[in-house]
Amino acid sequence: MRETQFGRKEIMSKDEYLITDAPLKALTVFAMPMILGSFFQQVYNMADSIIVGQFVGSSALAAVGACAALTNVFICVALGAGVGAGVLVSRYFGAKNYGKMKTIVSTSLISFLVLSVVLGVFGFSFSRAMMSGLQTPADILEDAVLYLRVYFVGFPFLFMYNILSTMFTSIGESRIPLGLLIFSSILNIFMDLWMVAGLGLGVFGAALATLIAQGISAVFSFLIFLYRMRQYKSPFKRFDRQELASMLRIAVPSVLQQSTVSIGMMIVQAVVNPFGTQALAGYAATMRVENVFSLIFVSIGNAVSPYISQNLGAKKIDRLKKGYHAALVLDLCFAVIAFAVIETLHTQISSLFLGKDGTALAYQVSGDYMRWLGYFFIFMGIKMATDGVLRGLGIMRPFLIANMVNLAIRLSVALLCAPRYGIAFVWLAVPAGWLANFLVSYAALRRSWPTENAAAPQ
């Protein structure tokens, strides 16, 4: 216990290890539950694809996969919104200003709940128009629209769960989100099997199973986080417009970056769709696999952000570069693992999604795309770590520019070359975009490292 600036007693948080332990140890302890959580998040997402592909067929798999690029846009709005709140929560937590921290939490939950309902209504209302605009093949359009509409009914649950997960990690707690993800992933798989294989509900059953699992997970997350916040007795405001403005200054560039990249992937999806249902099935299968491995590196980047922000808030400037270097070490280790797994098991991994119904074209597209990514995941790793440091420091403009460069390379090659020279050009430019992103971010970071006189928020 200790006395606070408000004259109240406050607990010493066990989650302050990010500002006390050795950087590599602290990041490893913090990141590993996030990495495991990312794995279960993808198990959660892939359950629909695997079960639909195995029990309904490759056309149904293509319908679910065709929704992925669009749903990612809306997910990225949630993730980007969480960044703005998370950076400030971490910094106030590091500075031990728990009243401001709780004000940020309350303000963000109220604001983003309203936003999630608005986006859910919009997405449900325009599902058919959006899928038609993506040139979704006619034979899978109805299933894709059905899946998407059920998804948007549950969107507020997904949105709030992602915001709450960011809040947990911002205070150095990565184990609770992991436990909730494991629970919801297992629940989602059982419900998928029951509704798709047992009841024969097809893509509707897969979407409904996901909605129910997300809803239960979001409710549990809220109740647990509410309990945690009550341990900090400092007074706070339920809603603060000035703090909302501070969040938005960080969140808006992140939302723009993540949403624009996802919109770019929607455009890439539109490039892939004319190649036919089987090519789309192979592409969708590897997109799921890419998400599994990429979220490992995303998790490390997400772990380094609160590490940087908490240490900046605590004025421990000497620990910032050490944390960045520790993140790069973790990225290298996982890049080697990803390469080994993909190079050895790419055919078996593809078969999980495509099953016996997949054609030679679907397997070729999936295998070629997957192996190419395996060679260059290290570029994604160093990009994510550098971006994570920029976010933790609140340096958002170079972060946004770097990611736009990445997107421009991927889009230009896909749009100009794929229709003329073949579908392979959809993925050939991916590592070049990652590398360019890293170089721009790193150049900005070298100019922006805080000095010992950097101020923490009060």
Stretch-by-stretch model annotation:
Residues M1-A31, V89-G154, G198-V252, I308-Y375, ...:
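Short alpha-helical transmembrane segments in multi-pass integral membrane proteins
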Residues T20, L24-V43, A47, L70-V77, ...:
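Residue-level signal for short hydrophobic patches within transmembrane helices
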Residues V29, V52-N72, A138-D143, V203-F204, ...:
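Interfacial/gating helices of multi-pass transporter permease domains
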Residues V29-D48, V150, S184, A213-S217, ...:
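Transmembrane helical elements of multi-pass membrane transporters/channels
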Residues F39, V43-L61, M131-A138, W194-L201, ...:
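Helix-terminus/linker motif at the lipid-water interface of multi-pass membrane proteins
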Residues L61-V121, L158-P177, G282-H346, M380-G394, ...:
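Small-residue-rich hydrophobic transmembrane alpha-helices
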Residues V73-C76, N188-D192, S217-F222, V292-L295, ...:
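Hydrophobic transmembrane alpha-helices of multi-pass small-molecule transporters
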Residues G82, Y151-T169, P177-S185, A206-V219, ...:
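Short runs within selected transmembrane alpha-helices of multi-pass transporters and secretion channels
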